[in-house]
Amino acid sequence: MAGNQGNYRENPTRNEKKYKKANGQPRLKEKSSRAKSDNVCPYAKKCGGCDYQGVEYKEQLKNKQAYMKKLLKPFCFVEPIVGMKNPLYYRHKVHAAFDCTRRGQIVAGAYRKNTHDVVDIESCMIEEQESDEIIRDIKDMLRSFRIKTYDEDTGYGLLRHVLVRKGYATGQIMVVLVLASPILPSKNNFVKALRKKHPNITTVVLNVNDKKTSMVLGDRNITLYGKGFIEDKLCGCTFRISPGSFYQVNPVQTELLYEKAIHEAHLTGKERVIDAYCGTGTIGIIAAKNAGEVIGVELNRDAIRDAVINAKRNDIRNIRFYNDDAGKFMVEMAQKGEKADVVIMDPPRTGSDEAFLSSVVKLSPERVVYVSCGPETLARDLKYLTKHGYTVKRATPYDCFPFTSHIETVCCLTFQGR
């Protein structure tokens, strides 16, 4: 989701709600015929984050395929959903909230659905296992280092959250300690003890969040060990991942998703491409190898900073980045008489707004490659674009989040004229 840069709310792993209705589109229906799975999570009833918990993976894919076919039937053919060979332990970004019970027990894990009550979770079947082990050991270390967990009601305490990010291809690990204060007692000894347990840790960052807010990360980062970031490889390119950077959590499926998006763009080396909602520049940088020129546009300043670094890191010289609203940027391009051959759009789950879509129509690129993480908003946006000169032949869904109801989709729209 390239639009959800930097900070985020609560625990995106286990506490996201099911899709809400958009333009009268139905919800993803409850599974009436459940083929039982051997992979049953002991925290399922308390956590509530995995809508397909206990359902055989083939049945999950069958349900998602049927849902997408019904939803996109007015617009295009839906190709078979691309599932995973191994749908377990795929999340390479793991977040745990910390709290202390009335009995004094330190707990770490997910928020109970629709609450801020922390469910103590030792390991999660969709999270990278070493990351879970690190969080578990941090929880055990708190008492010996006399570190108090933060209390949201009183504002007392220090440790609020722990975020662990691991590079799939590089194996590099970043641990982010989210504290209510910039001061961590015995910080050097704490980091030393943590690295003794987990020598693979590449960097440790202290993130300061001293506000009464449901946002996980604050604005200030203090590097305690290492460089303050990690790197990972995707589609032959290397990307820098900072504490607040957006980077897809399922690298296996993301590579397939992005390869499909680039394929649908039909690049020959001459095209001018706009990467809207470009985030840290992943899709644009990958596309630049086969395009004439790429322009990345993103509102989040920190994401643009990472995008520029990523382009330099990969020696990509035919890409430029702008810290601007993508819709406004494209309207101004059209007013100046400038053209683009391809627009690649990867909006947040809420989809695009009419202002952005109208800017696409004004610019009238030959092809629009839509990378969607929200099926209902994809259908809504396709309805607008197909009414304004675009056609779409097919869409390909990807199961990037097994055991949840979320679906990513790639489709290419072609301009036929007004």
Task: Describe the function of each predicted region.
Residues 2-31, 186-188, 192-418:
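Rossmann-like S-adenosyl-L-methionine
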Residues 80-87, 152-153, 161, 165, ...:
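Short, solvent-exposed loop/turn elements at beta->coil junctions and helix N-caps
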Residues 99, 164, 171-180, 238-242, ...:
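Short, aliphatic-rich beta-strand segments
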Residues 120-122, 126, 131, 135, ...:
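Accessory substrate-recognition/RNA-binding modules or partner subunits associated with SAM-dependent
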Residues 149-156, 273:
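Short helix/loop segment immediately N-terminal to the Walker
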